[in-house]
Amino acid sequence: MDDQKESLRKIITTLALKNEEIQNFICSLKQSLENLEANSNRVQEDLESEFSSLHSVLDDLKEGMVTRIKQERASRTYELQSQLGACTKALESSEELLEFANQTLCSSENDSFTQAAKDIKDSVTMAPAFRLSLKAKASDSMNHMMVDFTHERNLLQSITFLPVPATPEIHVADCQVFDNTVTVVWTLPEPDSKIDHYILEHRKTNHEGPPRAREDYPWMVVEGIKETEYTLTGVRFDTRYMTFRVKACNKAVAGEFSEPVTLETHAFVFKLDASSSHQNLKVEDLSVEWDSSGGKVAVQDIRKEKNRTNSPMHSPARTAMMSPKRAPSARVGRDRFTAESYTVLGDTMIDAGQHYWEVRFDKESKAFAAGVALRSLGRFDQLGKSNASWCIHLNNWLQQSLTAKHNNKARTLDCSIPDRIGIYCNYEEGTLSFYNSRNKTLLHTFRTKFQQPVIPAFMVWNGSFSVQTGLQVPSIVLSGQKRNSNTSSSNASLT
């Protein structure tokens, strides 16, 4: 009995699910019927509108051509009627003269005959009949106004519904990725004059293969593209790849999307590490503000920290000389910077390759520095004052100056102070260059040999700055590095 009840419950559950499935399908069918009715009305209205437009064009053409025929007829009629009137008057004059000549010829008076003959001769000389052109000024032919609409009629007879556009194909070999721009190039299998525009979709991804059902980033849409290529500019490359697909559209319908194509968008991406920054710095992912009250909220903790760091095991000197394997990392909870080291590090190490990032800072900051540091940078160390960091330093305390600093040596830079600095690091070559990012003017280059991974490093006192990552090394910087490979700007020039 219990088994039968359980079996019946399963049947009831199955029937209920099937009924719900059928009900959902019925709702879907009803919605499809409504959509079909609405779509049919829409396309019928569009069809009637198109034919009305076509009729209007034909009516306008007919009216224009009929008007030209009427104008041509009126012009020729005027010419022929004018010529006819002149000829009629000339004929009347000639007939009168002929009658007068006949009468004179029959006259028996010799005296009057001589004078009359002389007058007739003079009249004939001046008669309009002898000054008229007997060639018609206008032709009666209207053959040049004939028409033959056979070709147009055939075209009209070939009118049909718009075909669905073919699927484009993206040519990976012709696509380009450089200077944070992406150029995508595609073609259609066959030329199609009815294509009105293209729609390009793109999205960021960290997966090289085909798009996944669930991605972290949505498709972004670019509409109204008239050519078979498009360039995205000013893209922040904060993922490893970007996926693209494109479809063609005629006036009324869009075709299928092309096969997605994934392009590599390599760039250096990092965030600022708030966990190890100085407490007077208010740190967001990519920006920092000076906070004078930041270090006062945990006075007791700071005192305990000072007591702990006074021991030989935690002295600044020992911290600065620790082995890289034991050194605190920006990724794994290193000690906070303290005292006058108003420093914040990036959260990503550089141990290979060429990288570029930019920083925009408040030029009214009392002090600001940007560069790179070793993982072993001590928590009391200021940027540029030890052999574990290289930086460019802005000082606004007494007199504004811009200096390059490393290992407590400095060189004043003779240049205008920019508000945005580009930083280029070539780990293998041991090159660290600073640029005015507005015009890519080289400010200074350090040449060294990195023995350990380095980290983006920043310092600010009474000011603020923001970092822009996800940038490729600009091509102008790469070409400039080749030209300036023997530049005198180096560690040796610091004094």
Swiss-Prot record:
Keywords: Cell cycle, Cell division, Coiled coil, Cytoplasm, Cytoskeleton, Microtubule, Mitosis, Nucleus, Phosphoprotein. GO terms for biological process: cell division; cilium assembly; Notch signaling pathway; regulation of cell division; regulation of mitotic spindle organization. InterPro entries: B30.2/SPRY (IPR001870), B30.2/SPRY_sf (IPR043136), Bbox_C (IPR003649), Butyrophylin_SPRY (IPR003879), ConA-like_dom_sf (IPR013320), COS_domain (IPR017903), E3_ligase_FN3/SPRY (IPR050617), FN3_dom (IPR003961). GO terms for molecular function: microtubule binding. The modification Phosphoserine is found at residue 490. Residues 4-99 form a coiled coil. May be involved in microtubule organization and stabilization. B30.2 box contains a microtubule-binding site. This is Fibronectin type III and SPRY domain-containing protein 1. It comes from Danio rerio (Zebrafish). The gene is fsd1.
